[in-house]
Amino acid sequence: MSYRNQAIFLGEMVMVEPGSPLLAFSDHVAELVERTAGTIVAVHGGGRWPSSGIHWRSGVIVTAEEVLERDDNIKLTLPGGRVADASLAGRDPTTDVAVLRFQPDGLPVATTADARLRVGQVVLAMGNHDGEPLAAFGIVALAGGAWHSIRGGTIDSLIRLDLALSPAAEGGALVDLQGRVIGMTVLGPRRRALSIPSSTIDRAVDQLLARGGVFRGYLGAGLQPMKQERASNESQASGNQRGVLVVRIDPDGPSARAGMLVGDIVTAWNGKPIERVREVMRLLGPESIGSTVDLGLIRGGASTALRVVIGERPVA
């Protein structure tokens, strides 16, 4: 190997000569970390350890809802170590976004962007560990379309990251190589690192600041999947239709007013087949409030239908 090469390998050691592209890239990443770190705070919200948050708008911190275990006595550790009080403006479990208010006192606001990510794109996960910057380097492992969380929230794109995300960095920033905050990092199933895109965050922030909560459609019925044996019997009795079982009716709720009964099986929503509880949760988004829905049912082995006006309730 020629000594004129920019990277010289000695066993497991890599020596990078001054002026090499690799060294320039390393310096650029370090500069991005330094520049972004001033907009990231540590959030003390009652968990086993602090998480992170992003100064999204002036006086507004965005963090991961799932790690915020209390609604009051929330503290922030700002870059440099200063501690500030924060109050909860609202939380949305369906998108994993919580919004805090605080006195910024000159703390810079993150530069955010709604970026279209590609698999293989290099990104940084930025957090705050008791006032000190925390960073992880990796790539976008999966870039998919819109999806629905288990709580029924709409996430504008599915972004999975190939990087090691510290629990202390959850709720922190996903940063591109232009220094823009393009999402919030969270830990998903099997502790995989995911990102909530900035467009989803902006939508949640607008609603939380305006109303203090995220309101969703309200059916007023408790649903659960049918056991396999019962599902098979009901399917045979109703032409192989599947559905979800009604196990509770809220008094004076939309379903009660429409005449739904415990033991009914919901098989369709405006003609669309229903087989899982999650499908109903997805359909009860904010846009469903006030709408009239035709539900297909099985009652006593016979098919019937009900018309229900969807109500409104805040997400708990």
Where are these regions (language model features)?
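Short loop/turn microsegments at loop-to-beta-strand junctions
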Residues: W49-S51, A169-G171, V244-V247, L261-V262, ...
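C-terminal cap/linker of serine protease catalytic domains
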Residues: F9-V33, A125, L177, V181-Q241, ...
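PDZ/PDZ-like domain micro-motif
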Residues: A168-L174, K227-S238, D250-A268, L283
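Active-site region of chymotrypsin-like
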Residues: A37-T39, A98, F102-T111, L134-R191, ...
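Conserved PDZ fold ligand-binding element
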Residues: V60-V62, I182, S255-R278
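Residue-level recognition of beta-strand microenvironments
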Residues: S58, A64, A89-R91, M126, ...
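Conserved active-site neighborhood of the chymotrypsin/trypsin-like protease fold
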Residues: V16-P21, A42-L134, I159, P167-A168, ...
